[in-house]
A protein has these predicted regions:
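Short amphipathic alpha-helical segments
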Residues: 73-77
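Charge-rich, low-complexity segments
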Residues: 1-71, 184, 194-199
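Long beta-strand-rich cores associated with HINT superfamily self-processing modules
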Residues: 68, 81-190
Length: 200
């Protein structure tokens, strides 16, 4: 029934719907509160090669239907927010949206990964209305602050470059976790300063 091209169109459409709704929220905040909680929105769709590789690793049939039924991270949206409170505000708005169905939440801000990674993850089932009817596509959404995104981007680069030397990799692991703690503290300070300014 599905080709990989049709699959890509479905998930691309779901991403556009989520991004449109995020921009509506952001513009409303700008109008009502004179500020934008969202700094940036990024998105991506897994390539057919990446989808095939993941299905093979999971020992599942390598077909578009199998990908549709078994993978929830084909479509991804990353929302970069200004403050920690903005993350939860955006997550709540998406969760409460009547068109979207919440499938899963993982809060790596309150419960960081062992390596120091912090972000708020959620999977939403997004309805896409095609010419032949409604289709549901899961979209993985990562919401994080500018500081969290800075750490995650550099951690990925450093980890990738250090894999050839186990000693350097082990040393970097500890240092990166320390950096994560420092950045988390800065995030909280910025949040506190923002709250003080709002009380003026």
């Amino acid at each position: 029934f599905y080709s990989f091209l049709e699959l890509e169109h479905l998930y691309d459409s779901a991403i556009e719907l989520v991004k449109t709704q995020l921009n509506i929220f952001d513009n409303e905040f700008s109008m009502r509160f004179q500020r934008n909680p969202i700094h940036n929105i990024e998105s991506r769709i897994k390539t057919p090669q990446s989808i095939v590789g993941k299905l093979q690793r999971k020992g599942m049939p390598v077909t578009p239907e199998s990908a549709r039924n078994n993978l929830t991270d084909i479509a991804g949206v990353r929302v970069i927010c200004c403050y920690i409170d903005d993350i939860y505000a955006i997550a709540d708005l998406l969760t409460d949206h009547s068109a979207f169905q919440l499938r899963k939440i993982k809060d790596y801000i309150k419960n960081p990964k062992p390596n120091g990674y912090r972000s708020f993850h959620m999977i939403l089932d997004v309805p896409v209305y095609m010419s032949n009817g409604k289709e549901i596509a899961p979209v993985e959404i990562q919401i994080r602050t500018i500081a969290m995104d800075f750490w995650a981007s550099l951690e990925h680069q450093l980890h990738y470059k250090s894999t050839g030397d186990p000693k350097i990799a082990a040393s970097l692991t500890g240092e990166l976790k320390e950096c994560s703690e420092t950045i988390s503290g800065i995030d909280q300070k910025m949040q506190d300063m923002f709250k003080k300014i709002n009380l003026l």
